[in-house]
Amino acid sequence: MDFALTNFGGIRVPLPAGEITLEDISSMFPFNNYMCYCRMTGASLQKLLEQLAATPAFQATSGATVRVKDHRLESALVGGEPIDPERTYHVTTIDFLLDGGDKVNVGALSEEVVLSPVLLRDVMLAYVQDCEARGELVSGKADGRVIML
């Protein structure tokens, strides 16, 4: 995947310090948001990022570094590179954002959409379990992917 997107409104409580339990993950992600895999052009991905910049609060993303000023996208990198309008990008999101949830419409910008039977909370639980199995800590530290001016 080149880019991932979910909505902050779907993340209901912060990640607790210490051991993370199934109850913690269920409280963080209480909605039945199903994972979706989309294919879109760079031109469409650019439009999506512009759409996100125009909203009151940018959503939770991974794989991109963006700079937004006055609700306008100033710059965007995906995988550390400028967006190529001709390239095909692979995007992961949730079904809520496919047709207008939180004023985001990933589906309309996609050339292909594949709905998954897997819930976002299950993906997060698997991630936490994988980190635990490797002896790694899960961090909720902000990493500067989105800069709002």
Regions found by a protein language model. Name each.
Residues 1-149:
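Feature captures C-terminal
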